[in-house]
């Protein structure tokens, strides 16, 4: 399994909520046409956890997790017209100069899940059983 994460800021000349709506309802439709992606997760940053973690503001407005079967599937997707369409749509809401992407290796340290795969807590599990 190959996982890629992209981090980015929204365009400064657009309202952040409008960009979130575009990203969720329009950009995602284009993204999902890339059939080589096994998983596509949008993470919309909505604010710092607390004042201590706010620093000089949020460094990014969002990130995307994209999962592929293997490196060949990743390469094939990157070379596809569907990915080109996704790249062409990016500047409609994203500050492309802020875009960072990279391969990541996740290490799941805890994933309590319900029988159907939904994340849950121990308390939730007692209610499901």
Tell me the role of every PLM-derived stretch:
Residues 1-129:
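Macromolecular interaction modules
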């Amino acid at each position: 399994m190959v996982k890629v994460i992209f981090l980015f800021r929204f365009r400064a000349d657009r309202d952040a909520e409008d960009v979130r709506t575009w990203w969720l309802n329009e950009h995602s439709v284009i993204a999902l046409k890339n059939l080589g992606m096994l998983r596509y997760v949008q993470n919309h940053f909505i604010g710092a956890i607390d004042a201590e973690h706010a620093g000089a503001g949020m460094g990014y407005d969002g990130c995307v997790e994209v999962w592929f079967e293997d490196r060949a599937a990743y390469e094939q997707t990157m070379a596809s017209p569907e990915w080109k369409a996704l790249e062409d749509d990016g500047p409609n809401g994203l500050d492309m100069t802020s875009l960072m992407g990279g391969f990541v290796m996740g290490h799941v340290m805890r994933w309590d899940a319900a029988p159907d795969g939904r994340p849950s807590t121990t308390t939730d599990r007692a209610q499901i059983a």
